[in-house]
Amino acid sequence: MLKRCLWLVVTVLFAWQVFNGTAIAAQLDATTRTVALNDQGKNITLSRRQVEDGQRLFNEACASCHAGGITKTNPSLDLSPETLALATPRRDSVAGLVDYMKDPTTYDGEDSIAEIHPSIKSADIYPKMRNLSEQDLTAIAGYILVQPKVQGEKWGGGKIYF
């Protein structure tokens, strides 16, 4: 009898987590969803839908190389706020990340790397980028900027966290 009760409790808890776990995680408050829009100090509060779309699009187009905010091809350049802020031009805003996704440059901003990094400019080489609209790029950028607030130092922290 005790064994049946334990199995029932485990099943109920598992079912509750499956059906409610993602809904709870998706409820980000406005402060968490507020990120830098540009370098001039303007902010934008993303809708929950934008963050959800950003996550989906990031997973489809970016996560194969940037899962967890890392960069598989260059582990010293992650998607953490500090790394994005030190890039030239700065990439720690929605506008900066959208600009990068359109035409990526080296970390110092000197050279275009569109031929070796997926972008709108190189959509003929990277089909995952072909159908991304300006709104999609904004959602992806917003998702990238929200993640450090949600995951903390795990975002961009590397394999020690995964």
Curated annotation (Swiss-Prot):
Residues 1-25 form the signal peptide. It is found in: Cellular thylakoid membrane. GO terms for biological process: photosynthesis, light reaction; respiratory electron transport chain. Its main location: membrane. One of its GO terms (cellular component) is plasma membrane-derived thylakoid membrane. Binds 1 heme c group covalently per subunit. Heme c binds at C62, C65, H66, H117. GO terms for molecular function: electron transfer activity; heme binding; iron ion binding. SUPFAM superfamilies: Cytochrome c. Pfam families: Cytochrom_C550. Keywords: Electron transport, Heme, Iron, Membrane, Metal-binding, Photosynthesis, Photosystem II, Signal, Thylakoid, Transport. Its cofactor is heme c. It is a peripheral membrane protein. The keyword Iron applies. InterPro entries: Cyt_c-like_dom, Cyt_c-like_dom_sf, Cytochrom_C550, PsbV_cyt_c550, PsbV_cyt_c550-like. One of the extrinsic, lumenal subunits of photosystem II (PSII). PSII is a light-driven water plastoquinone oxidoreductase, using light energy to abstract electrons from H(2)O, generating a proton gradient subsequently used for ATP formation. The extrinsic proteins stabilize the structure of photosystem II oxygen-evolving complex (OEC), the ion environment of oxygen evolution and protect the OEC against heat-induced inactivation. Low-potential cytochrome c that plays a role in the OEC of PSII. Belongs to the cytochrome c family. PsbV subfamily. PSII is composed of 1 copy each of membrane proteins PsbA, PsbB, PsbC, PsbD, PsbE, PsbF, PsbH, PsbI, PsbJ, PsbK, PsbL, PsbM, PsbT, PsbX, PsbY, PsbZ, Psb30/Ycf12, peripheral proteins PsbO, CyanoQ (PsbQ), PsbU, PsbV and a large number of cofactors. It forms dimeric complexes. This is Photosystem II extrinsic protein V. The gene is psbV.
